[in-house]
Amino acid sequence: MDDLKSIIGKVATGASLSRDEAASAFDAMMSGEATPSQMGGLLMALRVRGETVDEITGAVAAMRSKMLTVTAPPDAVDIVGTGGDGSGSVNVSTCASFIVSGAGVPVAKHGNRALSSRSGAADVLASLGVRIDLRPEQVGRCVRECGIGFMFAPAHHPAMKNVGPTRVELATRTIFNLLGPLSNPAGVKRQMVGVFSRQWVQPLAQVLKNLGSESAWVVHGSDGLDEITLTGPTFVSSLHNGEIRNFEVTPEEAGLPRCEPGALKGGDADANAIALQSVLNGKPSAYRDVALMNAAAALVVAGRAKDLKEGVALGAKSLDSGAANARLKHLIAVSNG
């Protein structure tokens, strides 16, 4: 506790924490050793000053050390967003996950219920009939047998219950909004992470590099989406072979048409589930296109596609052959088995 007091005192001066100091502070918070006042003070001091790459790296390391892990193949990927983009869009990363799985790449999907939108990954999967409250070994079985499994964040990060009330009372974004997507319980080394603000694109790629990721894209749409968008360019920071590159991608690069922002608007969980099922059934739409765009990027990250155009072709084959839909049906069966 004295360590935590000195760390809070350091942050109060505007100084940055080392990776180890951040890990120690967040370990104390998630272990229930910190008081609500200490947690609130530290979180807001970091937020106002702006969290550094080392602070986020240490915080993620602490969160990962406390999570309930899942065994997944070494080539598994995750497609995940921070949420909090305020767009109320359809569930892009969830749909893209089935497309990627149908293309032969195992997916260990990490997600939660809606935080700021009307429908998060967990909400839409539950509406589709997938059982989401599985034990880690059951999720591992889904990934092995179905090529896709869903890890419901609260079930795998029980230590988060110690910071939950403080986060609710603060009612504003904190570093915790960034930690979840970087703390995949299956320990995947290949990720596509969407973020709610352009300012976090490159820093989070650096955090993933620090924590041993092999291949990753961190993305933010120019329209504010925490996905690759089709309304205009998307800002990307990619990690490959230990190098980070920053660039933009456009729908045209992938051979896809642009769409109006309203075309990606979603509804509640049931409405979004119906829309997702229609994509998996092969129906053309802007939703299909944006899901293909994001799946294509994940296939590039996974090393299955050399570029977005090839990724879109592989994704379209996954949809049109029925493979992606078969993955959903299999996941519903195994998760409820």
From Swiss-Prot:
Quaternary context: Homodimer.
Cofactor(s) named in the record: Mg(2+)
Binding of Mg(2+) 1, residues: 93, 227
Family per record: Belongs to the anthranilate phosphoribosyltransferase family.
Catalytic activity: N-(5-phospho-beta-D-ribosyl)anthranilate + diphosphate = 5-phospho-alpha-D-ribose 1-diphosphate + anthranilate
Residues noted as binding anthranilate 1 in the record, renumbered to the chain: 81, 112
Binding residues annotated for 5-phospho-alpha-D-ribose 1-diphosphate, in chain numbering: 81, 84-85, 89, 91-94, 109-117, 121
Pathway: Amino-acid biosynthesis; L-tryptophan biosynthesis; L-tryptophan from chorismate: step 2/5
Function statement: Catalyzes the transfer of the phosphoribosyl group of 5-phosphorylribose-1-pyrophosphate (PRPP) to anthranilate to yield N-(5'-phosphoribosyl)-anthranilate (PRA).
Cofactor note: Binds 2 magnesium ions per monomer.
Protein name: Anthranilate phosphoribosyltransferase
GO molecular function, one term: anthranilate phosphoribosyltransferase activity
Domain of life: Bacteria
Binding site for Mg(2+) 2: 226-227
Lineage of the organism: Bacteria, Pseudomonadati, Pseudomonadota, Alphaproteobacteria, Hyphomicrobiales
Membrane as UniProt keyword: no
Enzyme Commission designation: 2.4.2.18
One Pfam family matching this protein: Glycos_trans_3N
InterPro entries: Anthranilate_Pribosyl_Tfrase (IPR005940), Glycosyl_Trfase_fam3 (IPR000312), Glycosyl_Trfase_fam3_N_dom (IPR017459), Glycosyl_Trfase_fam3_N_dom_sf (IPR036320), Nuc_phospho_transferase (IPR035902)
Residues binding anthranilate 2: 167
UniProtKB keywords: Amino-acid biosynthesis, Aromatic amino acid biosynthesis, Glycosyltransferase, Magnesium, Metal-binding, Transferase, Tryptophan biosynthesis
